[in-house]
């Protein structure tokens, strides 16, 4: 059998199936590789074996070699431990971004090269173009499925060795192609959520690793409303799962998480989705990553997303001496959350991004002041 030139990341889903089919139809020398990133805990939540069987079936239909690699140890060390540490620190991480950077476009790419390939391909909805002597990461043609947000940590070396064969397709087109090609995954439901959690209750999953630390739920005026099982189980803007019943002298309106203070173990809530405590027009990030290797300029304007599938928001970006960013938005933003990813765009091009560190939301400013006081005492 010929040494494959391209190794396709086979997830067992329809997207990677069509990615492999398209490359195979172009007479590329390819092979498929299925990654196991999580050891099944017995609840069958990741459906890993079912996905593996589907990946094997697709490779069989296409007549290409199938490979398997277990990256669960690497995933635990490089993605999951960070995920837990962020929640323990009161932040809301995005494990998909880290998984792409550390697993799919690092360990998977290294494995592909060990198998003799010079490129990898995945079923991501994104595009890569080469012009002006560098590689550019672009949004997928199907904006509703675009995954460039999760790929913003990639750099020139990874893009040079990567293909996104379905980036020019709309999802309905893709399913039609899969059906016409006789791929058994053509009607398979899209996976949602985080694999290692699956369909389980998120809070119950976290409790296995972060034991409950009950505390008070308060309103913006510091009035006690109820109790919570642990502030790290909640995120800004969250409405579900607060278990706040009828509160005396309060309207029967839903409650929203507007802040959390780890120092006092207090969860703050308000009854208005448009609460001023959820609004911000400025954020500071951790040091940024740039797809091109460097920022466009010390100060520049672009658009940004502070959460997946958010509309583009115009902003001004200032690069600080340590590589972190100060971002000023034209319009007020809702529930900008520390730990989540800020991703920057110039039209359809993804420039890069960074982890959100803090914002000018009222309770976030208070948390930052308390943290600064604590650090001064420790010093």
Swiss-Prot record:
GO terms for biological process: tRNA wobble position uridine thiolation. ATP binds at residues 9-16, 35, 123. It catalyses: S-sulfanyl-L-cysteinyl-[protein] + uridine(34) in tRNA + AH2 + ATP = 2-thiouridine(34) in tRNA + L-cysteinyl-[protein] + A + AMP + diphosphate + H(+). The keyword Disulfide bond applies. It comes from the Bacteria. The record marks 124, 340 as: Interaction with tRNA. Residues 94-96 are annotated as: Interaction with target base in tRNA. Keywords: ATP-binding, Cytoplasm, Disulfide bond, Nucleotide-binding, RNA-binding, Transferase, tRNA processing, tRNA-binding. Belongs to the MnmA/TRMU family. This is tRNA-specific 2-thiouridylase MnmA.
